[in-house]
């Protein structure tokens, strides 16, 4: 029964994400936003505001270099983390500070942070929406990736 409840919450979150963060076609108002982040609170069923997010890019020597930082808005989103020119082919890591978020709500979480590591723009320039569905003891992530752009 607990599995079914968790699955339903996860699926509801995915439906919410698909409705709340539609892809904007290349060349429109959102064309300068090649990387967007969206965070949802699965416990409260709402966007997760003020979640600190760090983005790192993997260097040739295998180390992680600071790339971008931000905090989610009241809508649980961060736009304009980078520009088209800066967001080149490579391996990136998006780190969500989940511990501070849950502690700010008076909860004691299991994870210190959640991260997503992915390869970007390896088969043409794309736009990425990285979404995270958070709870104090679990998290799930998904990505919406546009078709290659010219």
UniProtKB/Swiss-Prot annotation:
The modification Sulfocysteine is found at residue 33. The gene is TTR. Keywords: Hormone, Secreted, Signal, Sulfation, Thyroid hormone, Transport. Its main location: secreted. It is found in: Secreted. Residues 1-20 form the signal peptide. This is Transthyretin. Belongs to the transthyretin family. GO terms for biological process: oocyte growth; protein tetramerization; protein-containing complex assembly; response to virus; retinol metabolic process; thyroid hormone transport. Pfam families: Transthyretin (PF00576). Detected in serum (at protein level). Detected in liver and choroid plexus. One of its GO terms (molecular function) is protein heterodimerization activity. InterPro entries: Thyroxine_BS (IPR023418), Transthyretin/HIU_hydrolase (IPR000895), Transthyretin/HIU_hydrolase_d (IPR023416), Transthyretin/HIU_hydrolase_sf (IPR036817), Transthyretin_CS (IPR023419). The keyword DNA-binding does not apply. Thyroid hormone-binding protein. Probably transports thyroxine from the bloodstream to the brain. SUPFAM superfamilies: Transthyretin (synonym: prealbumin). GO terms for cellular component: clathrin-coated vesicle; extracellular space; protein-containing complex; yolk. Sulfonation of the reactive cysteine Cys-33 enhances the stability of the native conformation of TTR, avoiding misassembly of the protein leading to amyloid formation. It comes from the Eukaryota. It comes from Gallus gallus (Chicken). Homotetramer. Dimer of dimers. In the homotetramer, subunits assemble around a central channel that can accommodate two ligand molecules. L-thyroxine binds at residues 38, 77, 140.
